[in-house]
Structure formats: structure tokens, C-alpha cells
């Protein structure tokens, strides 16, 4: 294949969730993404949703997506090969598995892409296939075979669309060289090189590891003699992965639950037993773990929210500076209105990352992270590049220049610090060269930051909370 250029410009996107239209009516979500400043919407579609019986197509969910798109929007559809009748592992949801009949799968993909021709920019074949058992019930060679069929069908139906490799997740990026997860993706990258245009990476864990993660997946491709542009199909934080003490306690309870003998026909699943045990001893848990629980103390909930707001900014800026031009935040909102289950482990791990929530049947409740996302999107509107600037004698200082043609200069600045306690440290004053007439600064929460000028220099306080420094209107 010829070299492939990265998608032009910079776009911030949001994932709707993992089950759009599966457990309820497909409600509007693209206008909500647009209202936050997002210009890319990612959504999941399942084979069984679209083709519930052989040869019978139901376009309810697909048309609901298309009806919400404006010409200026970009759309990314993750197509999961989950079907009660067409896949090796009969399932309406997850894990996805290989098609029983490759030709039938190709026809399904062709019909789907033809229905959306010219409206969907990115088509993705399943999600995090190395997360076997949970998201993909198959092998790496089977994924490559399905990816190859998928890519051929997409390109025949809509030559202008791009194919995205199933996301390379934290299971790969956090594992050591030679791990099963890395071996899985290495096989896919080696043998599936002609079947995708963009490499999707999922950026969880420590935000400051993002440049290394992006370079790691690029190196994975270069080892096999090629390279594709990298996009971030998911990111957000904080997650439990960032707190070793919290993760150790969680793993201890998980191990106890999964190794305890089941008693009786109504024995509770081990994941729910784990959650029940955590709530039973909540008062003695480390605060870095308690803050992920439902109804945790308000001061811990507020601290988690502040960390989330900071990381919405830092994760994006670090990814963009690494040459990623599309970032997609996980996630917009709960899957359905009114669902609460504090023993749901996935909710514990990722539920608080949602930007919005329901008020009755409407997605109208904005969390603090949604405001942080909208604020960042406003600052980055029209941006076409981000680069890190050298900070002499301050290795803990992160300074980034944003290119915004026609909008004036913008820098984003913060200091490294402990993810949980860093906000307790006092800010430090820094100087920046600033040859512009005006100088204004606000932080990731929208609060004004005092700026003083000394000739061509400006001084302002910095901390773990990112600061936006700009010359004109924000």
C-alpha cells in the first residue's frame, strides 16, 4: 500500500458508549457531542442489530445515527461481529467472535457500508481484539482473516472511507515485551498490514506515558516495515490503573472472590462478590480506591472530578503533541436512563468517566468533565498542530505551543505531580517569553489565572492543573 496521510486538522471526539440502541430506543447523542465542541462521534453497531435474521435487515439504529449527522461532523462506526445466528459464539452483545460464513459476513458489511456511503468516515473492525474472552472470542489469525474481509468489503462499498484497526488497549500497552497481548497485536500488525488505514490506540493509565505509548505502537508497525497514522479511539482518566495501592487492594479482593468455592445454585458471580466486599470494608479502603465507589464521601468525589478535568486536557494535549490528530473521549453518557447498580464492576471501573447524565429520558446533565472538554475544544478550535517546548532546568514542567491559524498564540502549561495529592502542592511562578500585546490565562476549570508582564516576559503560577495562556479572546 502507498503511504497513508494522517487525517487533516485536529478533531476532538466522544464515544457514545458500547451498546447504542441495544437496550432501549436509540436516543439523540450527536447534538450533545456537538454542543460540547466535539466534531467526531464514535458509536458501536452490532451485526445482530442490523441483520437479526439471515437476509433481513433492520436499519433502525443505523438510520438513527445518520439522521443526526451534519456535513461538518465526522463519524466513526465500530462494527462488532456479534450475532445470535451468524457467529461462532452466538451472542447479541459481547464478546464478538469470528463469522461462521466469511461470505455472509462480507455481504453484511457491504450492505451496512453502502447504506452509510459518504456519511461515515471511519469503519472499525471490532474493538480491542487482544482482550480475548471479554471483547473478542477468537485468535489473532482469526481476527486478521476477519479484518481482511472487512477491509475489502468497506473499500468496495465506499472507497473514500478509512478502515481503523481494532483498538490497541491498556492490556497491550501495560504488558511487558513478549506478553500474550503484545504477541497478539504483533501478529495482527505483521499479517494485517494491508487491511487497515489507521491504527487506533487506547490511552488509559498515566497521562504522561502517552508519548511512549504512541511511539510503542509506531515501533510495532516499523518492525514490520511500514507505518500507519495513529488515532486515539479511547482515552480518559483517572482509572484504577493509575493508583498502585488501590489496585493492589482491588486485586486482593478479586483473587479472594474468584478462588472462593461457590456455594449453592444461587452463588453470586465473583465480580459482584468483589464489589460487595469492597463496599463492606469501604471505610478502611485507601482514598484513591474509595473515590471510584458510588456514594463515596463528597470531598473524594470532588477530588476525583478535579483529576478527571485535568486529565481531559493533559491526555489530549500529550496525544496531539505526539502527532495524533483524532482523539475520542470515553464516554458521553450511561448506556440507558436510570440504570444504577453499584455492584456492577464495569460501572465501578469506568462509570464515572461519563461526561453527561440523564435527567429523566434526556441527556441534559453536564458533569464537570464535560465543561472541561468543552473549554478545551473551544481553545483548540481551528488548531492544526501542537508541539512541546523545552523548559530549561524544569523537567517537571510541561509547556506546549498550539498552532491556531488566524486565532493567535496559545500555550498550555502544567507541572508533573502525584495524580492524587499533586493538587495539594502550592503553585510555583514561572516566566515565559511572550512578545504579544495581550496576555490572558485561565485554568482547566475556567478560573482566571493572574498574569504579570515584565517587558517581553510574562509571569504566572503553575501547578498540576493545566493553564491556557493566550493573547486575545479565548
Predicted regions and their residues:
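Carbohydrate-binding surface patches
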Residues: 391-437, 466
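Aromatic/acidic polysaccharide-binding cleft in carbohydrate-active enzymes
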Residues: 272-371, 389-392
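Boundary/entry segment of secreted carbohydrate-active catalytic domains
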Residues: 1-40, 44, 167, 171
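Noncatalytic carbohydrate-binding groove/subsite architecture in carbohydrate-active enzymes
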Residues: 141-311, 315, 322
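C-terminal beta-strand-rich structural cap/linker in extracellular carbohydrate-active enzymes
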Residues: 452-474
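Conserved, mostly hydrophobic/aromatic
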Residues: 41, 69, 112, 123, ...
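Conserved beta-strand positions
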Residues: 14-16, 43, 125, 131, ...
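Substrate-binding cleft and catalytic face of glycoside hydrolase catalytic domains
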Residues: 36-56, 60-194
Amino acid at each position: 500500500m502507498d503511504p497513508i496521510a494522517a487525517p487533516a486538522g485536529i478533531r476532538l471526539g466522544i464515544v457514545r458508549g458500547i451498546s447504542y440502541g441495544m437496550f432501549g430506543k436509540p436516543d439523540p447523542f450527536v447534538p450533545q457531542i456537538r454542543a460540547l465542541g466535539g466534531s467526531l462521534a464514535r458509536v458501536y453497531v452490532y451485526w445482530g442489530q442490523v441483520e437479526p435474521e439471515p437476509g433481513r435487515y433492520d436499519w433502525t439504529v443505523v438510520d438513527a445515527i445518520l439522521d443526526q449527522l451534519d456535513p461538518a461532523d465526522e463519524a466513526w462506526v465500530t462494527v462488532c461481529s456479534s450475532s445470535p445466528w451468524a457467529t461462532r459464539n452466538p451472542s447479541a452483545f459481547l464478546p464478538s467472535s469470528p463469522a461462521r460464513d466469511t461470505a455472509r459476513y462480507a455481504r453484511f458489511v457491504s450492505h451496512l457500508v453502502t447504506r452509510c456511503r459518504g456519511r461515515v468516515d471511519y469503519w472499525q473492525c471490532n474493538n480491542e481484539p487482544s482482550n480475548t474472552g471479554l471483547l473478542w472470542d477468537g485468535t489473532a489469525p482469526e481476527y486478521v482473516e476477519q479484518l481482511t474481509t472487512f477491509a475489502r468489503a468497506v473499500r468496495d462499498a465506499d472507497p473514500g472511507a478509512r478502515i481503523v484497526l481494532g483498538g490497541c488497549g491498556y492490556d497491550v500497552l501495560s504488558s511487558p515485551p513478549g506478553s500474550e497481548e503484545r504477541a497478539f497485536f504483533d501478529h495482527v500488525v505483521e499479517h494485517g498490514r494491508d487491511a487497515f488505514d489507521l491504527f487506533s490506540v487506547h490511552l488509559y493509565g498515566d497521562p504522561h506515558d502517552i508519548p511512549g505509548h504512541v511511539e510503542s505502537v509506531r515501533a510495532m508497525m516499523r518492525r514490520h516495515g511500514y507505518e500507519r497514522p495513529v488515532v486515539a479511539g479511547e482515552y480518559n482518566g483517572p482509572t484504577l490503573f493509575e493508583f498502585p495501592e488501590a489496585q493492589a487492594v482491588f486485586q486482593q479482593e478479586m483473587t479472594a472472590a474468584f478462588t472462593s468455592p461457590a456455594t449453592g445454585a444461587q452463588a453470586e458471580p465473583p465480580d459482584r462478590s468483589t464489589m460487595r466486599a469492597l463496599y463492606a470494608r469501604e471505610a478502611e479502603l485507601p482514598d484513591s480506591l474509595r473515590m471510584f465507589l458510588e456514594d463515596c464521601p463528597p470531598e473524594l468525589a470532588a477530588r476525583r472530578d478535579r483529576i478527571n478535568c485535568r486529565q481531559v486536557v493533559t491526555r489530549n494535549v500529550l496525544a496531539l503533541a505526539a502527532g495524533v490528530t483524532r482523539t475520542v473521549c470515553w464516554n458521553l453518557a450511561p448506556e440507558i436512563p436510570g440504570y444504577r447498580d453499584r455492584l456492577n464492576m464495569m460501572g465501578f471501573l469506568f462509570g464515572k468517566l461519563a461526561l453527561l447524565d440523564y435527567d429523566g429520558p434526556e441527556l441534559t446533565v453536564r458533569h464537570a468533565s464535560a465543561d472541561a472538554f468543552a473549554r478545551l475544544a473551544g481553545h483548540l478550535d481551528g488548531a492544526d498542530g501542537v508541539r512541546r517546548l523545552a523548559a530549561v532546568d524544569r523537567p517537571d514542567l510541561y509547556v506546549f505551543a498550539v498552532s491556531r491559524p488566524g486565532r493567535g498564540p496559545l500555550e498550555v502549561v502544567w507541572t508533573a505531580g502525584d495524580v492524587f495529592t499533586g493538587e495539594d502542592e502550592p503553585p510555583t511562578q514561572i516566566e515565559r517569553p511572550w512578545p504579544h500585546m495581550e496576555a490572558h490565562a485561565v485554568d482547566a476549570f475556567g478560573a482566571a489565572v493572574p498574569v504579570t508582564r515584565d517587558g517581553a516576559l510574562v509571569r504566572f503560577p503553575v501547578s498540576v492543573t493545566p493553564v491556557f495562556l493566550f493573547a486575545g479572546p479565548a
